[in-house]
């Protein structure tokens, strides 16, 4: 067969992104094939070149120890707001206590952010003391403890909770990784209504399996997203 060239296709991607959970590595395969032109963009516009986020991200990518010196330059009385802080704790339980304090009080007050939607905890694991499951329960109990809700598979979902869609649902037009907020619930009929960016989506019964609390999410789930403030527990 033959075809007529009528345009071009660009395939942007992040070469340092975590590999897919499933099969396939399209971007790296295309680059390694040497059969298409490749352009590498290395100027960061989101942060300044001397940003500690930028500096430490490059260090981690190269397998080097991050620069924690910025944490020693900041005091509570300083007016200057830095973009990277390192806080050391002695054990996982203390880390959880610090996360609760930082995400609900210190960061929102100092940076004038909403603790519900502007601050995001990113954790490497689902399970464990500093895993997403435990942190979601702890954060929910502090940020949204008393709102009306329903229990589903040993998890409470309350009006006002931040939640994440866990799978693609083409009928509801919500997709894996979408963040929303519960705006209504009916415990008797096991129904939830979630406000996403463009629509309110209805869930009932087993459909609630598609949702999880999103006060804390895994690093893998966060790829492609951006947040005003991020807390990352490392043990």
Where are these regions (language model features)?
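Conserved helicase motor core of P-loop NTPases
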Residues: 12-163, 169-172
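Loop/turn-to-beta-strand initiation segments
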Residues: 6-10
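Conserved nucleotide-binding/hydrolysis modules and their immediate coupling elements
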Residues: 136-235
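Conserved RecA-like ASCE ATPase "motif II neighborhood" in helicase/translocase motors
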Residues: 1-5, 217-220
